[in-house]
């Protein structure tokens, strides 16, 4: 079963939340951000090239134009490959663990897997960001030395920055699966 909702991020931008329900013990959430627009790419490219052309007319050095083209292309490729994330996915399987995947605009994917035995809880935390209080979903990892301690806090959906209503929906589903996993591990 799959459903999709249109939501917004903390700045008012559009987000799409795709929820795929595979079984009571397996659930996937995918937050999709809008793709980069051709208009913004064109505006940045034209601005850099016009500035370079202005410098070229003053200095009459053709290396300025070549450098502007080269820097623009490298900057665009770097932005698409390392910065612009198209969608983030959270896959929860109660017997295995939690997998987080970030898919960049260039097609590159970054995946992190956390074993369920290391997961203490999934919570909604708050932070101050740019003079605002924002909420984010994070995974608390168990401390191997101290049984009731927390060794690490792993944030989820860092790039999309969804609003609280989206986080609550994902949080409740995560808690259902964690409760299902705890019930399965304690039963004989």
Curated annotation (Swiss-Prot):
Alphabetical keyword list: Cytoplasm
User: Is Cytoplasm among the key words of this record?
Assistant: yes
Entry's Gene Ontology cellular component terms: glycosylphosphatidylinositol-N-acetylglucosaminyltransferase (GPI-GnT) complex
Protein name per the record: Phosphatidylinositol N-acetylglucosaminyltransferase subunit H
* InterPro entries per record: GPI-GlcNAc_Trfase_PIG-H_dom, PIG-H
> Which Pfam families does the record associate with it?
PIG-H
This protein's source sits in the domain of life called Eukaryota
Q: Which pathway or pathways does this protein act in? A: Glycolipid biosynthesis; glycosylphosphatidylinositol-anchor biosynthesis
Similarity field:
Belongs to the PIGH family.
Where found in the cell? Cytoplasm
Please verify whether the record's keywords include Cytoplasm: yes
The annotated subunit structure for this chain is:
Component of the glycosylphosphatidylinositol-N-acetylglucosaminyltransferase (GPI-GnT) complex composed at least by PIGA, PIGC, PIGH, PIGP, PIGQ, PIGY and DPM2. Interacts with PIGQ.
Q: Name one GO biological process term.
A: GPI anchor biosynthetic process
The primary site where this protein sits is: cytoplasm
What does this protein do, in the record's words? Part of the glycosylphosphatidylinositol-N-acetylglucosaminyltransferase (GPI-GnT) complex that catalyzes the transfer of N-acetylglucosamine from UDP-N-acetylglucosamine to phosphatidylinositol and participates in the first step of GPI biosynthesis.
